[in-house]
Amino acid sequence: DRKMLLAAAERYLGRIMTENADALAKAPDSVLTLVPDAAGQPAILWGDSRLAVFAKGKNLLQPEIKFDRSIKDMAPEASQKVIDRVKLWVDAMKDKHLQGLVKIDALANEPETPAAVRALFAQIVDAGGILSRREIDQAIRALDNDMRGHARRAGLVFGALDIFHHALMKPGAVLWRTALFAAHDAEPMLEQAPDNAVHLKQGTFASAGHASRLGFRKIGDEYVRVDMVERLIKQAHEARQQGAIFAIDPALATSLGLSK
């Protein structure tokens, strides 16, 4: 009798899991989320159920997707449906939030891309799309004007202090970059800054390196998003060219929340 009850329970659970797999396969992308789990690992959830976590993979943009035991214990057909759906979702989210970085990675591996540009792109991808100009100075010096144009058409901004892709400041891009770095470095995900924040007070980040990974640069005792730093530098440069004393645009200062 016990064996019969266990067999019946297994059949019932198997049917439920199969139905869940079918539902997930047909569900929109919005039912899945990427969040840090209790250990800080980048985890993929369906509702409250953890399906998988990211781990170090081939490179930053290609993490290993480690599926939970519960998925592996499903019937093979149901398990494969879940695995395929999650992989499709990861690809779709990278294309949505990190499209510029994915494009740069592809260009870095195309023979038609000039060698000096490929070298620059490879370093940019390894850095997750944001890199201090000082760290990449030699690669920049190797570019002529045409090559710089090639890089700009791919979305790169050559700032006075940082080189970055303009689309990587959006909240979704920051979340995915943070998750990919956590997987690649086998470290917990960094705590996210508030969505669309451009200025943060001292103590927000454990290090300048953490700040850079979230798109911020330390200015004095505070942190400013790298694209906003470039706007400030551009305003100062334009004022200097006109022989005027630089005064920050009040609207920009207000948006940044800068201290006096």
Label each PLM-derived region with a short phrase:
Residues D1-S259:
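Acidic, serine/threonine- and proline-rich low-complexity intrinsically disordered segments
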